[in-house]
Amino acid sequence: MGEVERTRQSSSSLLTFKRKRALEACDSCRKQKTRCLAGSVEDENRACLRCRSLNMDCSLADPNHFIRKVENDNMDAISANINSKLENRLKVLEKAISSITNSPIAGQISLKSEKDVFLQGLLSMDEIELLLEIFIERYGKRWLSVDYSASQYMELLYTKSHLMLATACLIALRHNPSLKARIYTDVLNIVDRLISEELLTTSPSLQFFEAVSMLTLYRPLRLSQKQDLWLLSGFALQHRTLSSTKGWFNGFAGSSATLTYLDIVPARTWNHLCHGHLVMCMGYRRHAMLDENTFDDCRNILTNTKANEFDGNILGMLSVYSMLYRMLRSPTLDLDYAIFQLEEWRKEWCHLWEQPEPQYSRIAYFYSYNVVYEASIQTATDGNDFANIPRYVSMVQSYALKTIDAIFELSAYDMSRCSDHVLFHAGFASASLLRLIYAAKTKEVDTSIVQPKVLNDLVTKIWKWLLVISVDQYHLATKFANYLKEYQKTVNEGTAESTWFKGPLRPVSSTTLQALKPYNLGVATVERG
């Protein structure tokens, strides 16, 4: 019965929305009997989507425009019969006019809308729907809980957030080479400008947080990053904590059966944003803009009956990353206590490894052990405790291999949409193995513990895999691959100055190192002070 009620409510809501949209149709769309997607009510220029894409005057852009009622009720029935034909004609007309860029009408439209991907003639409605289909299928359903068709999602974002609309198109362009070659840089510039504007607002929209979380998971394809994503995600976290938007993320708590699917979306957005920020703290070797209360808030998602296995995966990763972060920020690394904490974590979260979802939390668990034992080598060396170093070396090798094995267990489809945190784990594990190979070649480690030939073959397999899944030369996968390939060459030549467990002093060229920044694949250390 509850399901029936929800269906009725949803249907009623949809009908109400459609009536409102029909009443607000502009003169041009009403004349053509086609759907009219008006701009946001907060926008000074409310020109509809169709008029913007065709560079036409729109009556909704007129501040004196008022809502008119349809004089003839029979017009709806007539328009229903010919609507499909008119839609086809509109598409033909749109393509014919899309090449016109110097229309005098463009100068009459407000500067606020110049960042609109439609007005600039970058993408047609068909192309945007195509990109949104890609985005929803590969990214939106998993990371943003998108439960719309491409056309519905375009409608939603066009009225609520041009930033999220541009971000979705930007990420989806990875999978459309022809469109990517044509407009990627332009769309990226739009995203940069919109982010700068949103950061100045006192209460950013929920879609702003969604856009930032997606950019932290899939950083833009460019030679060097214009936006510091660690700083951007940190600003977003502070916005949530200090501004009136905090209420969005607190309203999902509770396990009442009346909660809807959308009630959990803000909680997921918050957790994904925290996850992206914390991964960058590990990868960039920077301080986190989070505290203990933040992680308590993240756990609240489990009180929602709509939480699923992927929510658990994200929460499990947040838990182990925060634990590892605190270990590396402590004055000294207590290995026994670190192992105890990691095993306690495994007891609590290993049930996730039996789920059909990708085992991201398992990858994070092995990565954490890899880091802990590598940092322990530093601690042992500083304390002249050389007796335990062979055991630590063996464990570094073991957990680096386990990390790589877990990554290779991902499905081909999941590999094709790997987020940056998976690429980082693959890169760091491979760099750890290269440091061990180097130590064996310089006679610092017994070759009975480290087998350079086997590890070399595996590292080669890793950087070749990274190149296979890479989108272009600016993709993070390519940058990690180039780093590992060059590092491997330096190690095997054996001409670099020995620095023991830290590997060669200069394993790669400054150009390769600069391209990878701000990621740091150097040896794991305890960050004192």
UniProtKB/Swiss-Prot annotation:
Presence of the UniProt keyword DNA-binding in the record: yes
BP-aspect Gene Ontology terms: positive regulation of pyrimidine-containing compound salvage; regulation of DNA-templated transcription; regulation of transcription by RNA polymerase II
One Pfam short name: Zn_clus
UniProt GO cellular component terms: chromatin; nucleus
One of the record's GO molecular function terms: RNA polymerase II cis-regulatory region sequence-specific DNA binding
SUPFAM superfamilies: Zn2/Cys6 DNA-binding domain
Main location: nucleus
Cellular localization per UniProt: Nucleus
Keywords assigned: DNA-binding, Metal-binding, Nucleus, Transcription, Transcription regulation, Zinc
DNA-binding region(s) from the entry: 26-58
The keyword Cell membrane is assigned to this record: no
SMART domains associated with the record: GAL4
Protein name: Uncharacterized transcriptional regulatory protein C1399.05c
Originating species: Schizosaccharomyces pombe (strain 972 / ATCC 24843)
